[in-house]
Amino acid sequence: MIYNEVKNLFKGTDDKQSDFGWNEFSLEELGLPSADRILEGVKEIESKIGLFPWTTKHRIIEKYKGFGLTYNPNFIDEKQSRYSQVWGSKLIDQYYGLEKGAGDHTQLKNSYHDTFGFCKVDETIQEHLGFFLDRFNFPISRSRVAYIFGYGQEPNTDGGWHVDEPTCQLLRVNIPLQTSDEYVIEWSDKTYKLEVGKAYLWNTKMPHRPTMIRKVETKEPRINVVLGLTPWLDLNHNTCEYTPNKLFGKPVNDIVREKLFVK
């Protein structure tokens, strides 16, 4: 199995970051644009490229769709849209993550599972969301805008639980742009309602899931930006080569608490 060599940089590091928990900030205190302005950019992009459903070997999920904010110029499937690269693949078996195996992949480098391969921001994305993306201090890797079309859905008692990459490798910033009271995040035996106007960061190496607390009666989709940052790495944008940055090894909890992820 061929992996991205960037993984070697993290050998011997603390990938659990167990002191890193749940954090929330207002967009204003982070110096970020308003949710309304970000949503305007998202809608402009949607009008130009459309939305792409989550795809696996066994099914296509139309109720969960969106578009990628980053892409891999060397992606293994040349026919797949650059905007759908982070929306699964017909080679993967499971709904989330790599914890249950690689599916039909013969290599992980330059596949859906290659987090560090998603090193480029498309011109259309930059045109309409550059004012937002440029406000972050770290390189942007695997990132997406995610829509959940949950109207009529009932709560799922046990589905959707997953873990993501270690936060020292990919630190996710979750920003709700459009939501309603039915939608929540469950993490560490707690339930959180994410509010428009805030940004959330939590330890995604711990099991968590998006879900509903009751039948969804809101017809408009839930829309979140899920931005993945590389807090310990610098990126050469021309060559897509990563190197350790000056914060390499600094606890993620301190990076977030000190707001070092924004300019």
Residues of each region from the PLM?
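Catalytic core of Fe(II)/2-oxoglutarate
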Residues: 179-263
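A broad, low-specificity signal marking well-ordered, structured residues that form hydrophobic/aromatic
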Residues: 23-25, 143, 173, 208, ...
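A general secondary-structure signal for short beta-strands and their flanking turns/coil
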Residues: 20, 170, 220-222
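Short N-terminal helix-initiation segments at or just after the protein's N-terminus
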Residues: 104-121, 167-174, 249-261
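Catalytic core of non-heme Fe(II) oxygenases with the double-stranded beta-helix
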Residues: 126-203
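Non-heme Fe(II)/2-oxoglutarate
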Residues: 1-135
